């Protein structure tokens, strides 16, 4: 009977030590999740610069040839939608890291 009591006390002590370590580790994990979310959003900078460059070139093309406005606009919208997907994925990863991680 005494061995069972000692075992249960040792088990409770081990559980308390593990829970204290887990509490300290979870704060570090949250900090790394925020850091990862920030790093994931760095990828959006390139997307914004690329879309701005493409829009500028589309304006130049329309200024040179106004009759091709519909074709240039269609290509611009498709290109913008394709390039925007990477920033949406970066935002999704950041939100998952912040709220789930």
From Swiss-Prot:
Name this polypeptide is given: ATP synthase subunit c
Site entry (Reversibly protonated during proton transport), positions: 84
Keywords (A to Z) from UniProt: ATP synthesis, Cell membrane, CF(0), Hydrogen ion transport, Ion transport, Lipid-binding, Membrane, Transmembrane, Transmembrane helix, Transport
Topology within the bilayer: Multi-pass membrane protein
Compartment annotation: Cell membrane
SUPFAM superfamilies referenced in this protein's UniProt entry, alphabetically: F1F0 ATP synthase subunit C
Primary subcellular site in the record, as a coarse category: membrane
Subunit and interaction comment: F-type ATPases have 2 components, F(1) - the catalytic core - and F(0) - the membrane proton channel. F(1) has five subunits: alpha(3), beta(3), gamma(1), delta(1), epsilon(1). F(0) has three main subunits: a(1), b(2) and c(10-14). The alpha and beta chains form an alternating ring which encloses part of the gamma chain. F(1) is attached to F(0) by a central stalk formed by the gamma and epsilon chains, while a peripheral stalk is formed by the delta and b chains.
InterPro entries: ATP_synth_csu_bac/chlpt, ATP_synth_F0_csu, ATP_synth_F0_csu_DDCD_BS, ATPase_proteolipid_c-like_dom, F/V-ATP_Csub_sf
Ranges annotated as spanning the membrane: 31-51, 81-101
GO molecular function (one): proton-transporting ATP synthase activity, rotational mechanism
Record keyword DNA repair present: no
Keyword DNA damage: no
Protein role: F(1)F(0) ATP synthase produces ATP from ADP in the presence of a proton or sodium gradient. F-type ATPases consist of two structural domains, F(1) containing the extramembraneous catalytic core and F(0) containing the membrane proton channel, linked together by a central stalk and a peripheral stalk. During catalysis, ATP synthesis in the catalytic domain of F(1) is coupled via a rotary mechanism of the central stalk subunits to proton translocation. Key component of the F(0) channel; it plays a direct role in translocation across the membrane. A homomeric c-ring of between 10-14 subunits forms the central stalk rotor element with the F(1) delta and epsilon subunits.
Gene3D superfamilies for the chain: lithium bound rotor ring of v- atpase
Entry GO terms, CC: plasma membrane; proton-transporting ATP synthase complex; proton-transporting two-sector ATPase complex, proton-transporting domain
Family to which this protein belongs: Belongs to the ATPase C chain family.
